[in-house]
Each structure stands twice: as structure tokens, then as C-alpha cells.
Amino acid sequence: MKTEQLNLETPGGATIAHVARPDDAAGSGAAAAVILIHEWWGMTDHVRDLAGRYAAEGFTCVAPDLFRGKTTKDPEEASRLMHGLAIEDGLATISSAVAETRRAYGAQKIGITGYCMGGTFALRAACEVEGLAAAAPFYGDIPEDEALGRLRIPVLFIAGARDNWITPEKVNELKEAANRFDLPVEVVSYDADHAFFNDTRPEVYDPEAAANAWQRVLALFRERLQ
């Protein structure tokens, strides 16, 4: 696996993305790429580890830093960082990451995933950012109907039935919108808590649910990107 940084320019200011690439990426890079959006903690070692897992599966993984260098382990500070990030700013960073991934690595098809806050941005980007081919948001908030009505790419939405943030009621809103607008959305819910995929948080991590969700996401990206 190869790792490096990618510089991103946005109207809100410059930032970087952590990049993990397969060892056997030929030429300008792997043709299939995944944009990975971090949780409200920022660009943590856990995010870099996840990028490496995608690279090990043959994808170029680009994880943009939406907080421009800020990280925290404190939930109150994380909440302030998240609520201080305008949707438009985050989407602009994602759009820049998509464009730079195509330019720097020759990526032909690009997917997006994210967790918690990153899941919110991944789903919103699936509706609004050009150049994406598939999305796999984990327990992110649901956009309003105006945004969802623009969704055209397949979405695998991963949820936890015991999630007190992205509750089953919110997930049902997504299901209802998918039916109403005939959207290409599949929802998979596990008997698990919010953030069940994060193996650095033993109080919520669910290894069985995480392993199953991982295989589902890989299947989606292999079908749509590779």
C-alpha cells in the first residue's frame, strides 16, 4: 500500500486529503476510487486505517479533511466542529476531492462513503456532487426531499436499529422518500448502535455487524466501480 497527501483547493480555503493506493496501482493509478468522509472527530488514525483497508481491496481511497486540520476526542468540541461546517463548504471540498482524484490518479469511476457526519455528507454528495457512481453512507442524517429528488446513483445506506442519533424513524423517512421518488436506495439495518463500525470505540463497536456491512459495501463498489 502507498500513502500520500493530495492538496485540495476550495472556496472556503485549502485543505488536504489522505490517500491510500494499492501496491499494484498501474500507471496513473487504480481506475476505481472511493472518497471517504470522516466522522465528527476529524481526520483520525481510524480514518487513515479505513483508507488503507480500501487500498488493500484494490481501490484508490481519498479521504478529504473537511475540518482543515482540526481533530478532537471531545464530543462537545466535535459537535462544535460539525455544526460549524456549512453543508456547502463540505460539499465543495468533496467536489474538489472528486476532481483531483480523477486528475491525479486517472480514476474512471468514483464512489463515496462516510460515517456519522461523514455519512451525512456522503448521502448529500450522492445527490448533489457531479462525478460519483455509487454511495455507501453509514448512519448519516437524511437530506430534505429537494436534495433527495436529485439522486440518480445507487445508494447503500447502512443503519443501526439502536441508533439514538439517526433513529429508525429517520431511516424510515429515507425509505419513504425512496419509494416516493423511485430512488435507487437500499437500506440495511443492523441490531447495533450508532458508530458500530468504529473498531476504536469498544463501547459501540459490533464486529459481526461491521464485517457484514463491509462485505456489502465492497460488493457495491466492485459492481459499480471496478
Predicted regions and their residues:
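N-terminal cap/leader regions of alpha/beta-hydrolase-fold enzymes
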Residues: M1-Q226
